[in-house]
UniProtKB/Swiss-Prot annotation:
Residues 1-27 form the signal peptide. Its main location: secreted. GO terms for cellular component: extracellular region. InterPro entries: GDSL, Iah1-like, SGNH_hydro_sf. It is found in: Secreted. GO terms for molecular function: hydrolase activity, acting on ester bonds. One of its GO terms (biological process) is lipid catabolic process. The active site is at S15 (nucleophile), H213. Specifically expressed in anthers (stages 8-12). It comes from Arabidopsis thaliana. Belongs to the 'GDSL' lipolytic enzyme family. This is GDSL esterase/lipase CPRD49.
């Protein structure tokens, strides 16, 4: 382990999580925003559903760990909501089982510590035409529809309301933009840089508005090694140094 110890923010989910550290990804955005404040830890698993996640949740988040995460952001549902395959194989999970799985995951995370906070992300919509267009010749037919996405998204939101958890309703949020189909995805399913900006912005909004003590909003968290130093850059007048520990001018977008 490296020091100093920082709060941990864990991203736990399927491909939208695994790919979130790619160029312009929402995980990368959070890493930039929380630089020198918290460690963003990636636990993303391409193709996974809530059933597979439930099988390993106690290994990813052991209850006896010396340090527990301050925040866990969870996304499963996109693969669960795929239409069932005629073979009985594949990632589809019936709706009631999906809700039960997500509830068990939430309860496990709540048991980690009194200060572990949780945000669920619901299933975003898809560009159905583009999904069909990009069908891989190596895979049996992948059936994703917005009717199914909405059903699973609504169930996730309802579960979070029942458990008192924070949730980002991605299905509704994405569709606030008229051109969401063309700007939010790379292949009709996975997120473009613009789609990731929407996700990051919603997460940061939820964290800012949440009444958590201590606050996990990035502006409320101390910056590591932020003391003034004679080794800092020298000001234009040449008489003093300028502390750069809080600079954000290089961000592509100035986040609140």
């Amino acid at each position: 382990m490296v020091g100093p110890a920082r709060p941990q923010i864990v991203l736990f989910g399927s491909s939208i999580v695994q790919m979130s550290f790619g160029h312009g990804g929402w995980g990368a955005i959070l890493s930039e925003v929380y630089a020198r404040k918290a460690d963003i830890i990636l636990r993303g698993y391409y193709g996974w559903n809530s059933s597979r996640a439930l099988e390993v949740v106690d290994q990813v988040f052991p209850k006896d760990a010396a340090v527990q995460p301050s925040l866990v952001i969870v996304y499963f549902g996109g693969n669960d909501s795929m239409a069932p395959h005629s073979s009985g194989l594949g990632p589809h999970v019936p709706l009631t089982e999906y809700v039960d799985n997500m509830k068990k995951i939430a309860l496990h995370l709540q048991s980690l510590s009194d200060f572990t906070r949780i945000i669920f992300l619901s299933s975003p919509p898809v560009d159905e035409a583009k999904v069909r267009q990009n069908q891989s010749p190596y895979l049996s037919e992948v059936i994703r529809t917005n009717d199914l996405c909405k059903t699973y998204s609504d169930a996730c939101v309802e579960l979070c309301q029942e458990l008192g958890l924070e949730v980002v309703d991605l299905f509704s949020t994405f569709q606030k933009a008229d051109d969401w189909k063309t700007v939010c995805f790379t292949d009709g399913i996975h997120l473009s840089a613009q789609g990731s900006k929407i996700v990051a912005g919603e997460i940061l909004r939820v964290v800012k508005e949440a009444e958590w003590h201590p606050s996990l909003h990035w502006k409320s968290m101390p910056t590591e090694f932020a003391d003034d130093s004679p080794y800092d850059l020298v000001s234009a007048d040449g008489k003093q140094t300028v502390n750069s520990s809080e600079w954000t001018y290089f961000w592509e977008e100035q986040w609140d």
